[in-house]
Amino acid sequence: LRSAMVACFAYDERALIERYIAGTELAVSVVDTGEGPRALPPVEVVTDGQYDFDARYNPGRSEYFVPARLDEAVIEKVKTTAITVHTTLGLGNLSRTDLILDDEGTPWFIDVNVIPGMTETSLLPIAAEAEGSLDDLYDALVRNPLVHP
């Protein structure tokens, strides 16, 4: 902890310290193409350590399972959590909620991305392809721009 705090204080005089929660890292994308928000299949992210810039943007550094290797009830729970985050924050067409699922099956909110990545290594396109077609999603988004609750 001491070395981590020294590293943090090298950037600023304030630091946010959070409890570490061990578990499965999940990314749940929510899309709204005019029919209300719906969650895409959750993406399970597996790395050899940290999910940092290198692990995100260099193919082969992370492994993705879509849908996540969870039972259906847990998948529905994390999808509902992501939709709740999306609607509570009043988000528009797209968001991606990152969660940690602990060993008891409780999803812990990490953050929400209101402009999720759309590159070949980004998680929303991976989830969209697993559900059907990324091209179909793009088409629906173009036909229904700037949807807000």
Language-model segments: residues:
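Peripheral (often C-terminal) accessory segments that flank ATP-dependent C-N-forming ligase machineries
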Residues: P67-A68, A73-E76, T80, T88-R96, ...
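A generic structural-conservation signal
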Residues: I17, S95, D136-Y138
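C-terminal active-site "lid" helix and adjoining low-complexity regulatory extension at the edge
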Residues: L101, T106-P149
